[in-house]
Curated annotation (Swiss-Prot):
GO cellular component: a single term: plasma membrane
Encoding gene per record: nep-11
Descriptive protein name: Neprilysin-11
Positions with a binding annotation for Zn(2+): H682, H686, E744
Origin organism lineage: Eukaryota, Metazoa, Ecdysozoa, Nematoda, Chromadorea
Disulfide topology: C161-C166, C184-C833, C192-C793, C247-C509, C719-C845
Organism: Caenorhabditis elegans
GO biological process: protein processing
Length: 848
């Protein structure tokens, strides 16, 4: 599942997927996600980054390293060297100091050993005048009240790390932490307060955080690589650069204006909304749906997928699921609560009207504005009726309920308005039409939905049906036109997400190749920005995290031994995809991935995207002739995210997320385990959350739990639902949807616990690490938790925060920190939190 949140869906070109991801990938981005079963979870979405880092030329050796440092790092390194020198001098002085002064120091240490966290007057190292000086945090005991030592022997000063990696990690944290806050009261503010204060949300974004920073860095790097004037031996890489250039060709877009879209409308039989005398006698419902799906990838009234049969993952099969709405998946509340969301629906109405008016003007059409507006009202009213029959996402977590194997002939009874066999034969490649007949198997996710949508279609005028279908096609394709449509969309986004202005065009265009040619774009990125040593280090961490999960299973007292053994076997069977697929290093094999797709600099942007849709769909249908490939690494390496696929039982960590500030081979292990280690643990735990637990080690949907263990799991799961359901989201009056977010919350909780235990085991086997410079008063176990929280630093506009509550299966970032740590006794021990402190409640929810 995803690891974050995002705005509604305003673009159609994406693959469908069942993967659980670290953060939600925005549906209005161009980053693709692996194809998958529609029944499992919402399609991945991607959060819009902001401008942070602009990469320049590469440098070699020490000069390259120094030039790549930030200003803060350059300033901190000389300070660090001076600190080391002064420390050596100080030690020499201490050795020769009078014993009377030594005893006096010992007495003072005894008096201040129990100094409180939040009282600066009792802590001589922290003053009210300098709140940025970190407080002395007592080193972690195993008991909340450590025994007071009376030894007169001076404690040994902790070793401090001075490597570039330590300096860089320390800089990240020093620039983020608000150490005037007691970590036991609000650890999110403690770890992120300064970062959030010093990083306003850019006008071209609805939210900004450390995750968005990483996304933006990758996007900037891709931009530089795609703009290189080079021709390579790889045709697919050349096509990736040609796609970027066509997207950036504003001159051509301005010349074409709405011409390409009018060609589309003509192909589909004209849009009644724009026509004076639309001929309803030419209406053919099946043909309308065929042309929309086959040529433009737009599903209306139902969604069609090809993926592994959930109960026999050796084979691929057809899936049909309920529709999405124009505002995106999970947005039904916007339509159903028109009082609360009146401003949003007003913005949507205006958005539709402005697009229609622009098309009318460009086409020199004569239909009156009043008639057009009347049709627009009917479109919105119809979509409200459609929203009423769509099943809410938080009611779609029982995957067995969603698995209904039928035959195509059964669809004629459920939705008879569609002539199903010709429909499938028409959208499939011509060499595969023989696969579709009355007895062809298909898995239906929502049977009652199809019955209800049939009733809605039956009572709706054919003109309105055509208006709605073509509106969905228009909405999906206006982004490939000139910037007038971007201006219209931006006015809409200002209300829906709080985003104040459109991003520069290159930001969107840099992501387009990752949609059309994800592996080719990823190959460009990996060659320039990913080290093989990091791949090996990530693999070692995965092994450690997997062992840590197995230890948690063995240690728990609520599963029987047989179920424990099956759970551990499933964890040990997980497939690891790290960094990039091997094909990205083999250019001839890479080019074979894109046989049948031809893109050149002479192609218009609109035509490239249309060709890509047709090619993608043909490739998807070909999967029906092949076994399901559980080892397919079908995600662009340039994606900043992580994934778990239940049908593959596979975890995937693209190169894009294996980057600072979340991971580096030069970072201390405490930093890596707290950040990317928690991500790895998160994805492993997805195999054992409320949905992943329904699948076995081979990816098949069947119950492998004993009744008693399943009942115990359900009790613990409900605890998580209730805990998060009681959190009120900042800037809104809404509470977190504990039911919708439970899978991600279970994964967060398990992931951090696994990562912490894995780090503790590392220390046991390898010894304590030196501490971070400037933060040496914090133990490395304390830094582990700072590193985890730092992953989620950031904030959102009010509208975006509201949208997240309604549509996203992830909790807001603050609760991904507070919610997890409130359930970890180890955190309370490390920070010596008193009983019933805000981040150390007596009642804790523990699944894994």
């Amino acid at each position: 599942m995803p690891f974050g949140n995002d705005p509604p869906d305003y673009v159609h070109l994406r693959s469908n997927e069942s993967q659980m991801q670290l953060i939600t990938i925005s549906e209005n981005s161009d980053i693709p996600t692996p194809s998958g079963s529609p029944c499992f979870n919402a399609p991945a979405r991607d959060e819009a980054p902001s401008v942070i880092f602009i990469p320049g030329k590469k440098f070699q050796g020490t000069f390259r390293w120094w030039k790549s440092r930030t200003t803060m790092e350059k300033l901190l390194l000389p300070v660090l060297l001076l600190f080391c020198l002064l420390t050596a001098v100080l030690l020499a002085v201490i050795i020769n100091t009078d014993k009377r002064i030594e005893a006096m120091k010992t007495d003072h240490a005894t008096q201040t050993e129990h100094a409180g966290f939040g009282d600066p007057t009792e802590n001589p190292t922290k003053t009210a005048e300098d709140p940025r000086v970190p407080p002395i945090v007592p080193e972690a005991p195993t008991s909340p009240e450590p025994e007071v030592t009376t030894s007169t022997e001076k404690p040994k000063e902790p070793e401090v790390c001075s490597t570039p990696g330590c300096v860089r990690a320390a800089t990240h944290f020093l620039n983020a932490m608000n150490t005037s806050v007691d970590p036991c009261d609000d650890f999110f503010e403690f770890a992120c307060g300064q970062w959030n204060d010093q990083h306003p949300i850019p006008d071209d974004m609805y939210g900004f955080g450390t995750f968005a920073y990483a996304r933006e860095q990758v996007r900037q790097q891709l931009r530089v690589l795609l703009e290189q004037e080079v021709v390579t031996e790889s045709e697919s890489i050349n096509m990736a650069r040609a796609t970027y250039r066509s997207c950036m060709n504003k001159t051509q877009l301005d010349e074409l204006m709405t011409g390409p879209l009018f060609e589309t409308l003509t192909e589909l039989g004209e849009w009644p909304l724009l026509q004076e005398n639309w001929d309803k006698t030419k209406f053919n419902f099946t043909s309308l749906l065929v042309n929309s799906r086959r040529d433009y990838g737009v599903d209306v009234f139902f969604q069609l997928y090809i993926y592994a049969d959930s109960k026999n993952t050796s084979r691929n099969t057809l899936f049909i699921d309920q529709s999405t709405l124009a505002l995106g998946r999970g947005t039904r509340d916007y339509y159903l609560n028109t009082t609360l969301f009146s401003s949003h629906m007003t913005a949507y109405r205006k958005y539709l009207r402005q697009i229609a008016h622009l098309l009318k003007t460009d086409g020199n059409l004569t239909r009156s504005e009043s008639e057009m507006n009347a049709d627009i009202e009917k479109i919105i009213d119809f979509e409200i009726e459609l929203a009423k029959i769509i099943v809410a996402e938080d009611e779609r977590r029982n995957n067995t309920r969603l698995y209904n194997k039928r035959q195509i002939q059964d669809l004629y009874n459920l939705l008879p308005q569609v002539d199903w066999v010709p429909f499938f034969q028409s959208i499939a490649p011509s060499d595969l039409t023989h696969l579709f007949h009355n007895e062809t198997e298909i898995i239906i996710c929502e049977i009652e939905y199809l019955q209800h949508v049939s009733e809605l279609i039956e009572k709706t005028d054919v003109g309105l049906l055509t208006n709605y279908v073509l509106w969905r096609v228009v909405q999906s394709n206006v982004r490939y036109l000139d910037e007038r449509f971007e201006d219209i969309k931006q006015d809409f986004l200002k209300v829906m997400t709080g985003q104040q202005q459109s991003p520069p065009r290159w930001k969107d265009c840099a992501q387009v190749p990752s949609t059309v040619l994800p592996l080719a774009a990823g190959a460009i990125y990996v060659q320039a920005h990913f080290q093989e040593s990091d791949k090996h280090e990530a693999l070692r961490m995965i092994m450690h995290l997997r062992n840590s999960f197995a230890d948690l299973v063995r240690q728990n007292d609520w599963m029987d031994e047989e179920t424990k053994a099956v759970a551990i076997e499933k964890a040990n069977s997980m497939i690891n995809n790290i960094g990039y697929p091997d094909v990205t290093n083999d250019l001839p094999k890479l080019d074979k991935q894109y046989l049948g797709l031809s893109i050149s600099d002479s192609d218009t942007y609109y035509y490239i995207m249309k060709k890509s849709v047709v090619w993608m769909q043909s490739r998807e249908f070909q999967k029906l002739t092949k076994p399901f490939d559980k080892h397919e690494f079908d995600i662009s390496p340039a994606v900043v995210n992580a994934f778990y696929s239940p049908e593959k039982n596979a975890i995937t960590f693209p190169a894009g997320i294996l980057q600072p500030p979340f991971f580096s081979g030069t970072f201390p292990k405490a930093v890596n385990y707290g950040a990317i280690g928690a991500v790895i643990g998160h994805e492993i735990t997805h195999g054992f959350d409320d949905q992943g637990s329904q699948y076995d080690k081979d990816g098949n949907l069947h119950n492998w739990w004993s009744e008693s263990s399943l009942n115990s799991f359900d009790t613990r799961r409900r605890c998580i639902v209730e805990q998060y359901g009681n959190y009120t989201v900042p800037k809104t009056n809404f509470r977190v949807n504990g039911k919708l977010t439970q899978g991600e919350n279970i994964a967060d909780n398990g992931g951090v616990k696994e990562a912490f235990q894995a780090y503790q085991k590392y220390v046991t086997e390898n010894g304590e690490e030196p501490r971070l410079p400037g933060l040496q008063q914090y133990t490395n176990e304390q830094i582990f938790f700072v590193s985890y929280a730092h992953f989620w630093c950031g904030k959102k506009k009010e509208a975006a925060a509201m949208q997240q509550v309604l549509t996203d299966e992830h909790s807001p970032e603050v609760f991904r920190v507070i919610g997890v740590l409130s359930n970890m006794q180890a955190f309370a021990d490390v920070y010596k939190c008193p009983r019933n402190a805000p981040v150390n409640p007596d009642h804790k929810c523990i699944v894994w």
